[in-house]
């Protein structure tokens, strides 16, 4: 993760601790680099924190403090439940979460070795038995979303790196998988909607939420909005009973698909779904696919969410012969002036933000199996046939032809 003139790096998934570490303690190594000089990179030091890190938003550097949000025992080694270590303590107690603050020791090597990142503060035992689903650090505050059956939003005061404390907590149904700061007092999130009775998750529902954190000791859910790309038939009141499969949005796990445009207070989210339907005219069943970009008004003044419109790429499926293994779903979007551009593997559309009418489109050739895959096989068979014919005539394919020019072979 790059933060101004600092680069924080963590190793990719490492399974050594999971299978061979007898201490049963998962940990993440953190490496810091100074990249303020464009001509060189300076290694600052390394440190270690307990647990594993969710993503780049779980790491931050602010005024010399490196803040890391992590979950310990995230993999839940349930088969060790009830077993004790050599000291009689339980080996597995369930996952736990923490925010650790590191400082670069620099030239002061009295406490620890030079080039080390030492722990100066920590908040431990945040939401026992839950795991971190999203995190964000903004100035001297940290925000965490943990989940087991319900989604608590945690607000952490990091103004004193030596004594970080939890300021507030809010339990809301569902879970947020990405936190986007609109301003210092407002958070915009995307995630999965709640299941029945507000517990668990309904993976068929993508949910947008708006949080008011102006009072960090009492964060509130200002508004939430479930969104779906499916439409309701005339004879169906609930899209979940009309045969639609779970809808999904790449923005729930890839922040690059989450497009918020502050000048217009607009949010763009791609969504897709499908269903298996019966065509009474052709007397056949077929798949019906939907790919849309949902636009949402984010009213910061009144702290509310509302639908602005949508961009539909569903027709691109009709032009895609290989939709079953390619991606016609909208992947990215960008606001430019008074227009919204939507991108999928099959095309690009341009829509007016004023009335959402389409002003232009560009079709992109779909993916297809390389033609040489079959041609190579056919060529090999043809060469094999030629070799057989040459052998029958009593000469090898690489030998000169009986009546050919000097140096020419039969294969030529």
Task: List the predicted regions and their residue ranges.
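Feature marking well-ordered beta-strand scaffolds used for ligand recognition
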Residues: 4-412
